[in-house]
């Protein structure tokens, strides 16, 4: 075993840390984006329209709900784009909670936008709600795409409810969750072609193009680009597979210049083992030993299809990685006694910390 996984010792570069003030800046930027959206709505006679009659007021409120919904939708895209500064400052658990809150708030506001807009247009045109809904969907530019976007986002929200999520495998839930990106993309033409702010205000157009492009850049750079670059750079592969106990397997992984991968004991990565069909599904596994030069170790318990495949991995199998993620590291310890609680295979990050 020792000979099979012996690796050269190389000084590990300490992973970068996010400054403490970054938390305040990130929160301020998110709040500022909501204020800007409200200010743009106000500048486009949003408040005056509230007082111009019931139908016009409903339409104006619906427009505000749609704008705030779109802004929150982009905020949640950035939250889950795995931007390193956000990950290091907050950790994925907190980011995931905020993403969930922003997502549900955005969807509820989106439903409010649809309801108020239909009621407002129906009141102005003096026709029935169903007839007005049909007219909006069929005749307005981008509305068919927006309807498809609403259906996709509804699917994501329904499967994110805890009762529904417990019935789904993680891999299935994660795949369904990715449809949110398609939903955001399909909603954009509606805003471009029929959105009052886009059509009437150059300042609003500049703002929305900026935030859409920033969200897109965040996904392309941090969610897709960085993991691809690290996987190509480090060329990680399975070095050895060790049966630790019935149903428990450790995998040693070797790579090029792994001492440059900014990972600490206690963190986890998303692993894709290129061992055949199903390789595209990522699995979150924590390090079960501190990084050693050009070696990493994970320990996995057989709890499902993905983890069961780990025991059958062969040395030389190539691996794609995302991460590292997580804030359970010695970096945040400031001295004094601590209590670490874990059970089952959840012990693995603590083993790495206490090694």
Positions of predicted regions on the chain:
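Helix-to-loop transition at the C-terminal end of transmembrane segments
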Residues: 46-48
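FNR/FR-type flavoprotein reductase catalytic core
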Residues: 9, 30-44, 66, 70-73, ...
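Short, intrinsically disordered terminal tails adjacent to the first/last structured region
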Residues: 1-12, 256-257, 324
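Membrane-interface segments at the starts/ends of alpha-helical transmembrane spans
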Residues: 51-61, 131-140
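Helix-boundary and loop/linker segments of multi-pass membrane transporters
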Residues: 19, 57, 94-96
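Ferredoxin-reductase
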Residues: 62, 228-320, 329, 336-338
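N-terminal membrane topogenic signal
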Residues: 12-30
């Amino acid at each position: 075993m020792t000979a099979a996984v012996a690796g050269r010792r190389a000084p590990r570069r300490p992973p970068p840390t996010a400054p403490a003030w970054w938390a305040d800046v990130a929160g301020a930027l998110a709040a500022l984006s909501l204020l800007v959206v409200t200010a743009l709505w106000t500048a486009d006679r949003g408040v005056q329209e509230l007082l111009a009659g019931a139908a016009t007021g409903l339409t104006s409120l619906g427009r505000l709900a749609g704008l705030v919904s779109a802004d929150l939708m982009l905020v949640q895209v950035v939250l889950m784009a795995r931007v390193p500064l956000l990950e290091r400052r907050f950790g994925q658990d907190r980011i995931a909670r905020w993403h969930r809150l922003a997502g549900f708030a955005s969807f509820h506001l989106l439903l409010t936008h649809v309801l108020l807009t239909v009621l407002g247009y129906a009141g102005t045109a003096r026709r029935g709600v169903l007839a007005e809904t049909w007219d909006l969907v069929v005749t307005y530019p981008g509305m068919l795409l927006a309807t498809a976007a609403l259906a996709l986002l509804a699917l994501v929200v329904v499967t994110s409810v805890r009762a529904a999520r417990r019935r789904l495998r993680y891999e299935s839930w994660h795949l369904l969750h990715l449809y949110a990106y398609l939903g955001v993309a399909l909603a954009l033409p509606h805003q471009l072609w029929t959105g009052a702010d886009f059509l009437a205000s150059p300042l609003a157009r500049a703002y929305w193009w900026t935030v859409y492009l920033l969200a897109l850049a965040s996904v392309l750079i941090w969610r897709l680009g960085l993991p691809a670059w690290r996987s190509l750079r480090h060329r990680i592969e399975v070095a050895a597979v060790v049966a630790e106990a019935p149903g428990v397997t450790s995998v040693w992984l070797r790579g090029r210049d792994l001492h440059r991968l900014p990972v600490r004991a206690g963190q986890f990565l998303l692993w894709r083992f290129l061992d055949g069909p199903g390789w595209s599904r990522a699995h979150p596994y924590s390090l079960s030993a501190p990084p050693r030069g050009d070696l990493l170790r994970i320990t996995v318990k057989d709890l499902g299809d993905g983890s069961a495949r780990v025991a059958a991995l062969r040395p030389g199998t190539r691996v794609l990685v995302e991460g590292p993620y997580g804030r359970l590291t010695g970096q945040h310890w400031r001295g004094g006694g601590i209590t670490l609680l874990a059970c089952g295979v959840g012990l693995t990050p603590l083993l790495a910390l206490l090694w």
